[in-house]
């Protein structure tokens, strides 16, 4: 079955086999289909400041453990790594950002279209 749209909200930063997931998602889209991805700006100083001053404080007050220990293992992909992966498997990747600019944002949103079917198939065949 093929889909018009596949949407991912705050998941790609957690996926260890991200290229495989993106390639497979691209193959599940109809020709004019769209993959929509929203992610935190993991790897940026602004994102780190955001979670350390909110969730990090709350987590420490509740459990007396540094949240940074968890974050090292929770977010395995940075925003730039995710964007690079999307651009490899899709011809058209448009980004918008929650913040002043790409670098000064907390959250990123990507709309990906025109999957590069040949790259997806090649990656999935050689990844076995």
Regions picked out by a protein language model, each given a short descriptive name:
Residues 8:
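Active-site T/S-Asp motif of two-component receiver
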Residues 5, 16-30, 34-124:
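S-adenosyl-L-methionine-dependent methyltransferase catalytic module, highlighting the catalytic core
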């Amino acid at each position: 079955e093929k889909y018009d749209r596949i949407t991912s909200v705050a998941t790609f930063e957690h996926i260890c086999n991200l290229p495989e997931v993106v390639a497979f998602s691209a193959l599940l889209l109809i020709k004019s289909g769209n993959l929509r991805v929203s992610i935190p700006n993991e790897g940026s100083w602004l994102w780190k400041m955001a979670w350390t001053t909110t969730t990090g404080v709350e987590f420490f007050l509740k459990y007396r453990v540094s949240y940074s220990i968890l974050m090292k293992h929770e977010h395995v992909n940075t925003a730039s790594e995710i964007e690079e992966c999307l651009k490899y498997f899709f011809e058209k990747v448009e980004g918008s950002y929650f913040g002043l600019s790409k670098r000064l944002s907390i959250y990123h949103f990507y709309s990906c279209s025109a999957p590069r079917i040949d790259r997806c198939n090649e990656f999935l065949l050689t990844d076995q």
